[in-house]
Amino acid sequence: MAKRLPGNRLRPHVKAHKTSALARLQHDAGHQGFTCATSREVLGLAKAGLGDDLLLANETVDVSRLAAMAATNARVTVAVDSDATIDAAAEAGIRECVIDIRVGFRCGCEVDEAAQLADRARASNIEVRGVMGYEGHAMGVVDLDRRRELVKAAMERLVEAHSLVGGELITGGGTGTHAINTWVNEIQAGSYVLMDTAYTEQTDQPFSQGLFLQSTVVSVAEKFAVCDAGLKAQGMDHGNPSWGDGEILFCSDEHTNLVPDNSVKVGDRISLTPAHIDPTMAKHQVLHLVSKGEVIDRWDIDLRHW
C-alpha cells in the first residue's frame, strides 16, 4: 500500500489492527498520520510516540475523554457534525477538527449545514482542517462498477461541502475504495494490512490474507467436527469464517462446526480466516507473528477497548 498511496496520501485506520507495533511499521513506511476510532487508540498511539497527526474519525461529547486526548503531546484532530460535538471539543481544549459530512448512512451533517458548523468551530478557537466523509455503504460492494457509482455520488457531496468549509483535508475512503476514490486527498484504509474474507471477495483487491485465527479440534463426529473458536472469538457481522480445508457449518458461542475435506482428530490445530478483522482483533490480546510455521514474535493488541 505504501507504493500505491505513499506518505500522507494514506492515513491508516488503526481500528483494523489495534496494535501500536503494527502502526509503527506503517509509520516507518512513510505514513505519518493515523485514523482512530476510539480515544483509547488516540491515547495509545500518543503514548507510543506515534502522535504526529491523529484523527479521531468519530463524534463524541465525552469531555473527559476529549480532554485526555488534548492533554497529550500528540496533534489531535476530531470529527464534528453538530453544535454539541463542537462545544464538547472546545470545552475539552481540542484545537483542530474536520467537519464530518453525511455521504451515506453513517454520522455526519448535511452539506448545507457544513459552513455554519465550520464558523461555530472557528469562533470557538478550533481550526477547521477540512472535511471528512466515509462511504461505508460502498466499501464492501463486490461489483466494481456499482462500487464506483456509489463512491462518485458520495464524494460529490463531500467535495461540495469542502467548497463551503475550506481547509487542506478532504479525508475518507477505505480499503474497498482506495483505488477508485480519487476525490479525497487522503485515504483512511485499515483492513488492507491484514485483510478478511469480506474484502477478498472483491477481485480487484491486490492484498493478501494476513490474519488467521488458530483453533483446536475438540470433538469429532461421523459427519462433522467441532473446534473451540466460536462467536466470542471472531467478528461475525460479515458472516461465518472460512476454512481452506473444509466447509463451515455454523458458529455458536464457543464452537464452530465444520465438515473437513479430510479426516481430522481431536487435538488437531486448524486456521480459520475471519470474515471481519476489526471485531476479531478486539476480542484478543496478542498477535503471534508466524513465518514458515514458526512463531517469530508476539505483539500486544494494546489499542483495544475505549
Language model region names:
Residues 220-306:
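C-terminal accessory subdomain/extension
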Residues 147, 176-245:
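Active-site loop ensemble at the mouth of alpha/beta enzyme cores that anchors a bound cofactor
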Residues 10-133, 138-140:
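Active-site-proximal beta-alpha core segment in soluble small-molecule metabolic enzymes
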Residues 33, 52-53, 96, 130, ...:
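Residues at the N-termini of beta-strands
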Residues 1-6, 12, 53-61, 121, ...:
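Alpha-helix-loop-beta-strand connector modules within alpha/beta enzyme cores
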Residues 94-96, 102-205:
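Active-site loop/helix belt of alpha/beta enzymes
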Residues 39, 59, 136, 175, ...:
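Flexible loop residues that form catalytic
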Residues 17, 40, 84, 112, ...:
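Conserved active-site and cofactor/substrate-binding residues in soluble primary-metabolism enzymes
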